Design a protein with these regions (language model features):
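Charge-rich amphipathic alpha-helical interaction elements
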Residues: 1-126
Length: 126
């Protein structure tokens, strides 16, 4: 099998679409976290420790998502620059994209777990 370690135009175009999708998804997740946080604050809590813990988890998830969003944006900008300057040998861009893919996957898992915990807590607090 012949491995190509070049960021050809097709690969760069794919990565740009991938990054755009990630940025959109993270933005949607952050908007939903804002909404869930609002619901969390609007209900009466029997145990403030649970609410406080969930608020801390929301804050952490929001910070992690913001950092990931920034990293994706930097990669996106780099790929556009590579494309515009016809750089096809930016091996680091390939590695960075793979690392970002793993970070996005982990971030999504944490988000889903937090979302489920929040939905459960909110639904039992009425």
């Amino acid at each position: 099998m012949n491995m190509h370690y070049q960021t050809d135009t097709g690969r760069v175009a794919w990565y740009l679409r991938e990054n755009t999708g990630w940025l959109r998804e993270i933005n949607n997740q952050m908007m939903e976290l804002d909404e869930l946080s609002h619901h969390l604050h609007s209900i009466k809590h029997e145990d403030e420790r649970d609410s406080s813990c969930l608020n801390d988890l929301i804050r952490r998830q929001y910070q992690d998502s913001t950092r990931l969003n920034d990293a994706i944006y930097l990669q996106h900008t780099r790929l556009i620059d590579d494309k515009d300057n016809e750089r096809i040998d930016d091996i680091d861009a390939l590695c960075t994209q793979d690392l970002l893919r793993n970070r996005v996957k982990e971030n999504e898992k944490k988000y889903i777990d937090l979302r489920c915990d929040l939905m459960q807590y909110i639904s039992t607090s009425f």
